[in-house]
Amino acid sequence: MTNSSKGRHVAVLPFPFSTHAAPILSIIRRLASAAPDVTFSFFSTPQSIQTLFPSENPENNIRPHAISDGVPEGFVFSGKHHEDINLFLAAGKESFEAGMKAAEAETGRRIDCVVSDAFMWFSCELAEEMGVPWVTLWVSGACSLAAHCYTDLIRETVGMHDTAGREDEIVKFVPGFSEVRLGDLPSGVVYGNLESPFSMMLYKMGQVLHKAAAVAINSFDELEPEPVKVLASKLKLLTCGPFNPISPPPSSNLDEYGCIPWLDRRKAASVAYIGFGTVATPPPVELAALAEALEASSTPFLWSLRDNPKQHLPEGFLKRTSELQKIVPWAPQAQVLAHRSVGVFINHCGWNSVVESVEAGVPIIGRPFFGDHQVDAWMVENVWKIGVRVEGAVFTKGITMSALELVLSHDQKQKELREQVGKYKEFALKAFGPKQRSTCNLSTLLEIVAGYNL
C-alpha cells in the first residue's frame, strides 16, 4: 500500500469516555473540511461511535471505526470507580492497533499519521512502530497539562506520601503558576490513588508528550499565558482553542424543550443556568441544598437535569417554583449561555464548560469534583477572576445563596466579574481571526497531520 502526498490516511484515536471524544471530533472535522483528499479514520468504542455518529451515512472523509471496549464477554460490573475505563485502558493499545490494521486493509491505504487524545500515551509507541508522526490533542487547558508535565518535580518537592491535611497550602514553585493551592492540582499528581490505572495513564502521558510532532491544546494564548509559555519551552505546543468555536445563531430545531423561548421572557443577566455535564452530578443532599438556595433567593433558573427531578429535589419544590424555573433533561448549552438573560453558569468546572462560559461572557459558580476541575476552579476564581467556587466544594443552602447573591446582585463585585469574563470573551472571539495565533496554529496542525499548507 502506498500513498501520494495527497490522499493521505490519518488515524484518530480518542479517549472514548466523558466529554473527551466530542471536542476531538470537532477539531478533526475542521481539519477534514480543509483537507478533503485526506481520509480520517476515527476509532472508538461502539457506544462512543453511536453517540458521535448517529447517522449511518459517513461524514465525507471521516470514517468511524468501532473497536473493542475491553470488556470481556459476560463480564459483570461490580460498580467500582473507573471500572469501564480501566478495562479499556488494559486493552487499549491492542484494540487500536487491530482497528488500524483493519482500516488499512479496508481502504488500501497505509496510515501516514496517528492523531490521539493525549490520554492515549501508548499511541506514541504505535506511531513509532509504524514509522509515522504522532500528534496529540489535549482537550483541557494548559494549566492542568503543565501540572501533569511537571509531576515528578511536584512530587519530589512536596512528597508523594506527605500531603494529607495540606490541601489548603499555597505553593509557588509549580511551573506555569505564580501560586496554586496544593489541593487544586489535578487528580493523580499528588492526591488520589496514584497507583490506579487512570493515574498511571496521566503520569505516562506526561513522560512521552515531548516525543509528539505537535501537542495541540484546547486553549488560546491570552487565556493562559504563563502555562502556555512554560509548555512551549518543553513541547511542540500549538494553542488551537477553542476546539468548539462559538456556535452559529440559535436554531429552533435544536431546542426541543423550549429553553430559548423561556429565556426570552426573563430579564437580562437574571437567570442561573445549571448544568453539570454527563459524569459529575452532585449527590442528592447537595442537589436538595442547591434547590433550596434557588427557591429562598427567588432566583430564576434553567436546570439541565437528566434524572427524574422529583427523585432528588425537596418535596413540593417543583410546584412552589413553577413560575421561576424550567427543568429539562437536555439543553442546547451554547445557545443558552449566549442568551442575554443568563447571568451565571453553575457547573462542575470541567474545561469545556469553563471555555463555553468564557466564550459567552457568563460568570461561573463552580463546584469541582475530580480530574482537572479543581485547578480549573482555581483559575476561574483566583487568576481570571470570572467567578466563584462554592466554599468547601459542597453545596449548602447558605453557601449557595451567598454565591448567587455575589454573582447576580448588581453591585461592584458583580460588575467586576462581568467585566473580567467579557475581556476573555473578546479574546476568544478573536482567537480564530485572520493571522491570530489559533488560526495560524490550526494551519500548522493541518500541515503536520495532512501535508497541507494553507
Swiss-Prot record:
Thermal behavior of activity: Optimum temperature is 30 degrees Celsius.
GO molecular function (one): quercetin 3-O-glucosyltransferase activity
Sites where the protein binds an anthocyanidin: 18, 20, 148, 371
Function: Flavonoid 3-O-glycosyltransferase involved in the biosynthesis of anthocyanins conferring flower red/pink colors, mainly anthocyanidin 3-O-glycosides. Catalyzes the addition of UDP-sugar to the 3-OH of anthocyanidin, with a preference for UDP-galactose (UDP-Gal) as sugar donor and cyanidin as substrate; able to use delphinidin, pelargonidin, peonidin and petunidin as substrates in the presence of UDP-Gal, but barely active on malvidin. Can also use UDP-glucose (UDP-Glu) as sugar donor with cyanidin, delphinidin, pelargonidin, peonidin and petunidin as substrates, but not active on malvidin.
InterPro entries from the UniProt entry: UDP_glucos_trans
Residues bearing attached sugar chains per UniProt: 441
Name recorded for this polypeptide: Anthocyanidin 3-O-galactosyltransferase 3GT6
Keywords: Flavonoid biosynthesis, Glycoprotein, Glycosyltransferase, Signal, Transferase
Family: Belongs to the UDP-glycosyltransferase family.
Catalytic activity: cyanidin + UDP-alpha-D-galactose = cyanidin 3-O-beta-D-galactoside + UDP + H(+); cyanidin + UDP-alpha-D-glucose = cyanidin 3-O-beta-D-glucoside + UDP + H(+); delphinidin + UDP-alpha-D-glucose = delphinidin 3-O-beta-D-glucoside + UDP; peonidin + UDP-alpha-D-glucose = peonidin 3-O-beta-D-glucoside + UDP
Signal peptide start and end residues: 1-21
